[in-house]
């Protein structure tokens, strides 16, 4: 038996697996606070208590051999090593309070010089293309797009340290992401895995070390941060049960969906959408704005990935429910299929656009008329999210021309047939839906199972449906992209 604690954006779950079978699942809500518009805080103490309670349940009721952890990334937790208690509420990955601070940090001379060096490297590669595959050159090219963003752990940590000011001397400060916080509360060890570290904005994924220049800008030191371990190492014990299979949510999904080879693409459609491309054993650079991350580092292998994201997808569908467009999100696929309107377009910018734009633009609904229906609005929303995914896939296929004919999908929003069909139609790739929508916990259980020697890598979740491209959406997609460019320039 393997128990997986899955700390997501809205719920923390315990999933218990017997080999490949899910035998139990328990859920509790993640307690969040929104003290100001754009602020998203998580009660870190409550999260830790629920984690410990789930670990007790896994041991006492199911006799698990091991406890695994998977989690939302980039949420920042700061706690006192003397007491083991959080100093602040955790700042969630959707928290945008540090917009101005991120802009200030991006004006730092270190960041500006790094970008300049990166632009020079890009110019050199155009003249000498043979250099583009050298790790140092790829590292420099990545610096050309270096930008500290409000959703990074780095800027959230900087905000908390500045808020503390001189008071920080009272504490034995320890910082990390949700995985390291939960590992600490279970085992007393201050550890993280490579997939979580790489997403913080504090870590150099090329050379596998915390970035001293970024730490200096943030005002932190390396002693404050966790040590990195391979995901299938033992992170400690809780009640004599080993903790292993510690892996970030998107990496766990990539693993669970069997995207183990270069060129494999998956899209996890949950609160937001995360599109990830396996690029193999070497880190890569993306002039187009994809994020270079570590997919996983295990004792026997390492994989890198490039990522593009949408801040709002499933949460956008929930928003339309909140305002009364429908009373049940499960109805949205059927509603969208009923719509005959092909003129309505929507720009799904609720708190701005992520990859590859990273700009704050107004959300737009175009093509309203006295004949429009609720079904038309639902269709426009689902298509707009599919179009945003297509933007990211376009960059991936342009920069990394692997031979691939499919995208694999998981996440709760992937239960929507209309949505997945539109992804297939606009990308021209078949879409395979995982039979287990919660790929995060399934992937963590696979990694923990490997740590125990239960199975080899060639075991992943099954797939319950394949969506083949069946409609030419190229003209509608072109019009949508034109509307997106208009929205960027729109000032009222």
UniProtKB/Swiss-Prot annotation:
The protein's matches in SUPFAM superfamilies, at most eight in alphabetical order, are given as: Actin-like ATPase domain (SSF53067)
Q: Which GO terms describe its biological process?
A: glycerol metabolic process; glycerol-3-phosphate biosynthetic process; triglyceride metabolic process
Q: Which Pfam families does this chain map to?
A: FGGY_C, FGGY_N
User: Sorted alphabetically, which keywords does the UniProt record give?
Assistant: Kinase, Transferase
Q: What Enzyme Commission number does this protein have?
A: 2.7.1.-
Work out whether the entry's keyword set contains Kinase: yes
Q: Which GO terms describe its molecular function?
A: kinase activity; phosphotransferase activity, alcohol group as acceptor
Q: InterPro entries recorded for this chain?
A: ATPase_NBD, Carb_kinase_FGGY, Carb_kinase_FGGY_CS, FGGY_C, FGGY_N
Q: What does the sequence similarity comment in the record state about its family?
A: Belongs to the FGGY kinase family.
Entry protein name: Uncharacterized sugar kinase AF_0866
